[in-house]
Curated annotation (Swiss-Prot):
GO cellular component, one term: extracellular space
Keywords carried by this UniProt record: Protease inhibitor, Serine protease inhibitor
Identification of the protein by name: Serpin-Z10
PANTHER family (alphabetical): SERINE PROTEASE INHIBITOR, SERPIN (PTHR11461), SERPIN-Z10-RELATED (PTHR11461:SF304)
Primary role: Probable serine protease inhibitor.
Pfam families: Serpin
Single GO molecular function: serine-type endopeptidase inhibitor activity
Domain notes for this protein: The reactive center loop (RCL) extends out from the body of the protein and directs binding to the target protease. The protease cleaves the serpin at the reactive site within the RCL, establishing a covalent linkage between the carboxyl group of the serpin reactive site and the serine hydroxyl of the protease. The resulting inactive serpin-protease complex is highly stable.
InterPro entries given in the database record: Serpin_CS (IPR023795), Serpin_dom (IPR023796), Serpin_fam (IPR000215), Serpin_sf (IPR036186), Serpin_sf_1 (IPR042178), Serpin_sf_2 (IPR042185)
RCL: annotated span: 333-357
Reactive bond (site feature) positions: 347-348
SUPFAM superfamilies reported in the protein's UniProt record: Serpins (SSF56574)
């Protein structure tokens, strides 16, 4: 499979995941999540699984092997520098019970291919310490944006665990054309229930990457680039009730994101987008099971290639995959982070069109040269943090 096809498949999985998350757990709220974080964790689980479980995960990810996901990741990680205005880091962590040991082949894969840190812990006697350790790891690898991924309510689950796998994604990008904070003013944002809230809107007088399509507009806001080029895309329905039809359209058109990219800067009339900052967390394993990925979560989940044990890992299964993401968009740029933890057990414009994002919209953060989507979400109410 060519790299381009792998990325296209990855983005198709993104859309499927987004539709299911919105339909089942978003409950009419703001949403942000990192599909790449969930996919990396699934890839890591596949690498430690027997053939049946591995094949089901790879089929879900629409990839022939875990190597293809590593190639996708390389497209967005490579190219950064310490002094860059753009920061992207993806980290993996593994915690294994002190009475078990990782199979050498799996440990080698974790450390060399996934660059994962591995620690031995006492799940049964010191579950609170394990929770603190995982949460500290998440905080460090998201630059403090996510301070807790495991709650105290998970003590019983942790106490009976053998293995905890975690992935963290952190992104911070500065706009290539920043907004002047002195021009930020409060305006009405119209909610789905017909009411409105006053929120700060950013604006500037620069030309914008903007294009109109049937029923919606797309705005591209580039970040300062290094060897990579990241952008935020805002997909704004023309109608206040147009979000659901737009999501349906995105899900029904192959390569939607590649086919709806504003390529030219144009003069814009009224131009306003809201500042927003929020987090979202959900049990990703429940969504994945609803989508047909069941094998890793069943008793005898086939995680036979992970640990050395008398049962050869036959009794291991993934009890849950927890995902938490947060995002902040302001005049300077975007800061976003996500952590996934798996516990084993074109229409032409009239002149100077407007772009006023004063109603619910979808967004992505994507690397433009490869097309990889890093974050995706919806903004229903920017006043909710």
């Amino acid at each position: 499979m060519e790299l381009g096809k792998s990325i296209e498949n990855h983005n198709d999985v993104v859309v499927r995941l987004t539709k299911h998350v919105i339909a089942t757990v978003a409950n009419g709220s703001n949403l942000v999540f990192s599909p790449i974080s969930i996919n990396v964790l699934l890839s890591l689980i596949a690498a430690g699984s027997c053939s049946v479980t591995k094949e089901q995960i790879l089929s879900f990810l629409m990839l022939p092997s875990t190597d293809h996901l590593n190639l996708v990741l390389a497209q967005i990680i490579d190219g950064g520098t310490e002094k860059s205005d753009l920061r992207l880091s993806i980290a993996n962590g593994v915690w294994i019970d002190k009475f078990f040991s990782l199979k050498l082949s799996f440990k080698d894969l974790l450390e060399n291919s996934y660059k994962a840190t591995c620690s031995q812990v006492d799940f049964a006697s010191k579950p609170s310490e394990v929770i603190d350790e995982v949460n500290t790891w998440a905080e460090v690898h998201t630059n403090g944006l996510i301070k807790q991924i495991l709650s105290r309510d998970s003590i019983d689950t942790i106490r009976s665990s053998t293995l905890v796998l975690a992935n963290a994604v952190y992104f911070k990008g500065a706009w290539s054309s920043k907004f002047d904070a002195n021009m930020t003013k409060k305006n009405d944002f119209h909610l789905l229930d017909g009411t409105s809230v006053k929120v700060p809107f950013m604006t500037n007088y620069e030309d914008q990457y903007l294009r109109s399509y049937d029923g919606f507009k797309v705005l591209r806001l580039p970040y300062i680039e290094d060897q990579r080029q990241f952008s935020m895309y805002i997909y704004l329905p023309n109608d206040k009730e147009g979000l659901a039809p737009l999501l349906e359209k995105i899900g029904s058109e192959p390569s939607f994101f590649d086919n709806h990219i504003p390529l030219h800067c144009i003069s814009v009339g009224a131009f306003r987008i809201p500042k927003f900052k929020f987090s979202f967390e959900f049990n990703a394993s429940e969504v994945l099971k609803d989508m047909g990925l069941t094998s890793p979560f069943n008793n005898g989940g086939g995680l036979t290639e992970m640990v050395d044990s008398p049962s050869n890992g036959d009794d291991l299964y993934v009890s849950s995959i927890l995902h938490k993401a947060c995002i902040e968009v302001d005049e300077e740029g975007t800061e976003a982070a996500a952590v996934s933890v798996g516990v084993v057990s074109c229409t032409s414009f009239r002149r100077n069109p407007d772009f006023v994002a004063d109603r619910p919209f979808l967004f992505t953060v994507r690397e433009d040269k490869s097309g990889v989507i890093l974050f995706m979400g919806q903004v229903l109410d920017p006043s909710k943090h």
